[in-house]
Amino acid sequence: MAEIKDIHALEVLDSRGNPTVQADVVLASGVRGTACAPSGASTGSREALELRDGDTSRYLGKGVLKAVEAVNGRIRDALVGKDALDQRALDAAMLELDGTDNKAGLGANAILAVSLAAAKAAAIEKGVPLYAHIADLYGQSGQFRMPVPMMNILNGGEHADNNVDIQEFMIQPVGAPSFREALRMGAEIFHALKKVLAARGLSTSVGDEGGFAPNLASNAEALAVIQQAVEKAGYVLGKDVTLALDCASSEFYQDGQYNLSGEGKSYDAAGFVDYLAALCDQYPIVSIEDGMDESDWAGWKALTEKLGDKVQLVGDDLFVTNTRILKRGIDEHIGNSILIKFNQIGSLSETLDAIKMAQDAGFTAVISHRSGETEDTTIADLAVGTSAGQIKTGSLCRSDRVAKYNRLLVIEQELEGQAVYPGLAAIKGQG
């Protein structure tokens, strides 16, 4: 037994300068696990509740002292003396203590920080890397897989102050032989893109996730400048590198219309499906996240019927890492992949359940950061520990993003060739 001796929390800052919760779980052996909760900008309406203070005299109302108090009080009282190795029992105890469907009682940010800190403490107690401990919790056996990164090198939407409607334009170095080489390819393309933008007299400032955020005439132009950057870096688009989008469509969906204000165009669901299909015909786009609004299930059905056999269709705001909603998607053949974000559901155990349900149904699971991140690198270990095969953790700058990539480099080196880099085979519809 790895007895929990103490738990305490602290209000710290995330990468956007907003408060978040950091928790420490201390074991009787003296081992300490520390974790921070991330925070999103474009959020699904069904996500677990992030508890904020609402006190406008502090941090513009975004303080998390209530969540910190929940950790230092009720959560600590409930978990001290329990076994950190029994992750599911710890998470269940916190969910019972919270007593709500959306974690409004204690706050998903409070519960998650403790859940992850406990897992880290347990891994240290066992003397194994965190990814190995997560693999044990998940029931993962056999060869590990390193994740193919979705690198968000050009930002729009809620992640940038520009006129581009689609939120993320990403590259996937599928032709690389290893994660290390994939990271190198991505970095070289990132630097090439900066030169391409500068040559056009466009902004090379970056958005929340480290991607460039220039004003462009259309979403298609964003893809065109990325293609130019890929070629400038010496790679072949569609062979060495493929493209992925996060439309974050809920951010521009209103009254049944998809409004691309940057292009001055508006589409109904059928029209927007055709718009996305046309982009896929023009460019090697192999993955689209949140192609339709989170409430537009009919639109999602049409998108899946149109593109689902050849494009990975990832539900983020649609599924919010929630097994109940994911099951509906599986049953109704909506999408074919789920984005996994710890804080959408609020505990490690529930996150693992969502990955398991997806993989058992033949869906892929893409492990993801949030736009508001910290130096915490747990998602890197989660991606390897569950052999998810894909990770989305931003661009090739900003230390809150690069920290995850650097952690994956360490993991790959530790595994010394025991972990395969799956390339295109990791992406639904491409293997």
From Swiss-Prot:
Keywords: Cytoplasm, Glycolysis, Lyase, Magnesium, Metal-binding, Secreted. It comes from the Bacteria. It is found in: Cytoplasm; Secreted; Cell surface. SUPFAM superfamilies: Enolase C-terminal domain-like (SSF51604), Enolase N-terminal domain-like (SSF54826). The active site is at E209, K341. (2R)-2-phosphoglycerate binds at Q167, K341, R370, S371, K392. Its EC number is 4.2.1.11. GO terms for molecular function: magnesium ion binding; phosphopyruvate hydratase activity. CDD domains: enolase. GO terms for biological process: glycolytic process. Its cofactor is Mg(2+). InterPro entries: Enolase, Enolase-like_C_sf, Enolase-like_N, Enolase_C, Enolase_CS, Enolase_N. The keyword Secreted applies. GO terms for cellular component: cell surface; extracellular region; phosphopyruvate hydratase complex. It catalyses: (2R)-2-phosphoglycerate = phosphoenolpyruvate + H2O. Pathway: Carbohydrate degradation; glycolysis; pyruvate from D-glyceraldehyde 3-phosphate: step 4/5. It is an enzyme of class 4 (lyase). Mg(2+) binds at D246, E289, D316. Binds a second Mg(2+) ion via substrate during catalysis. Catalyzes the reversible conversion of 2-phosphoglycerate (2-PG) into phosphoenolpyruvate (PEP). It is essential for the degradation of carbohydrates via glycolysis. Belongs to the enolase family. Component of the RNA degradosome, a multiprotein complex involved in RNA processing and mRNA degradation. This is Enolase.
